[in-house]
């Protein structure tokens, strides 16, 4: 996954080197889909591991500004803002440029930091960039980079998908027109099923290569969270993840081949091996990652970009995102962020940016949390009817 390009530090090292945890929790409150910005300290109840906390102060932040503060125990509030946009996108969509337009036109302010991570590499916009260059210039530059890198970085992936389509159709025709399929590839021979073995082997290699490209590395996700933990202020991370489809040999074709070659143990063994690749195993522990993201104070928003499936004769187009989608949704929910599936990623981005801009910081009286390194959970409740509060699930006590 491309987010590995941002920083390579160990999450454990980052946590040990970070300053002591500020005793506070960031809370977003909505009602009917709109932010609620007029709550007071008395409207909130905060529990830690089921034990009520004494809230010492409340700070309301709207659009990067402190609107009001209440209570005498308020900790210093950093108004620094950093935005990280992650793109796991294989097909360029001009709608993505609308999201970048909105970022510069309606979200970013002087002093904000931006990181853009494409399928090819990461780019960082320093906090003073908006003061030295126009928003229009920066927006065009970022859009050009995004489009170029998506087209460039996804070339290998698209090539593998096309290879899988070709091989799937060819293997699917093995029971009837196999000799015709082999006629286009001089490296294969049809006698004794040798050509079929070669095609299955190539198909398996293409599957392995595709898995390597899309691998979500848990250690890198933890390191990413650890790298952001010492960063002060609001930390908004928005991931665009495009729905993926993979060409697979249809069950009917698989059964027909296994029946036809039941006396050929080599081909039967190769076909059985494919079932192992079709099994979708989780590639990262969402529970561990969501704790690291929550502890780092990250607002993580997950935008699942829908994509229409294609029909391929002789193949089954299998959804390939089911092993990662639930995990990222879980991380978003655990950090007080949002998760959305949409054919319009620009609209989903606007919603995520709006949600992240207005929040309350509830400060706790000092000395209530023993620094034993255990993960402690939060529960924040709002007394006003109809209000929904979202917040990080907890923190590592230090």
Predicted regions and their residues:
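Bacterial N-terminal signal peptides
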Residues: 1-10
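Scaffold/interface architecture of coatomer-like assemblies
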Residues: 14-398
């Amino acid at each position: 996954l491309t987010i590995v390009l941002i920083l390579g530090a160990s999450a454990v090292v980052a946590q040990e080197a970070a300053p002591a945890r500020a005793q506070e929790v960031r809370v977003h409150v909505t009602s009917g889909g709109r932010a609620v910005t007029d709550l007071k300290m008395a409207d909130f109840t905060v529990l830690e591991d089921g034990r009520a906390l004494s809230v010492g102060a409340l700070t309301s932040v709207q659009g990067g500004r402190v609107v009001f503060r209440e209570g005498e125990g308020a900790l210093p509030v950093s108004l620094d803002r950093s935005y990280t946009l992650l793109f796991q996108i294989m097909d360029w969509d001009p709608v993505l440029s609308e999201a970048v337009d909105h970022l510069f036109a309606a979200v970013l302010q002087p002093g904000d930091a931006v990181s853009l991570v494409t399928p090819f590499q990461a780019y960082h916009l320093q906090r003073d960039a908006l003061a030295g260059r126009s928003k229009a210039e920066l927006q065009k530059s970022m859009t050009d980079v995004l489009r170029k890198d998506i087209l460039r970085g996804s070339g290998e992936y698209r090539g593998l998908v096309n290879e899988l389509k070709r091989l799937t159709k060819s293997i699917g025709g093995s029971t009837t027109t196999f000799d015709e399929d082999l006629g286009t590839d001089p490296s294969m021979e049809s006698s004794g099923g040798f050509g079929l073995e070669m095609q299955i082997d190539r198909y398996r290699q293409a599957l392995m290569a595709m898995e390597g490209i899309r691998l979500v590395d848990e250690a890198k996700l933890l390191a990413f969270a650890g790298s952001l933990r010492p960063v002060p202020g609001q930390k908004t991370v928005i991931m665009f993840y495009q729905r993926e489809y993979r060409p697979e040999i249809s069950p009917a074709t698989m059964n027909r081949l296994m029946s036809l070659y039941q006396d050929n143990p080599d081909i039967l063994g190769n076909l059985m091996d494919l079932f192992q690749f079709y099994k979708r195993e989780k590639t990262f522990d969402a529970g561990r990652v969501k704790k690291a993201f929550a502890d780092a104070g990250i607002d993580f928003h997950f935008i699942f970009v829908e994509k229409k499936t294609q029909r391929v004769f002789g193949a089954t187009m299998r959804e390939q995102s089911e092993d990662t989608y639930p995990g990222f949704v879980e991380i978003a929910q655990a950090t007080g962020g949002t998760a959305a599936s949409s054919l319009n990623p620009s609209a989903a981005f606007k919603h995520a940016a709006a949600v992240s801009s207005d929040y309350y910081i509830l400060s706790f009286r000092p000395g209530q949390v023993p620094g034993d390194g255990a993960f402690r959970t939060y529960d924040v409740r709002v007394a006003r009817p109809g209000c929904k509060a979202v917040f990080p699930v907890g923190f590592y006590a230090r």
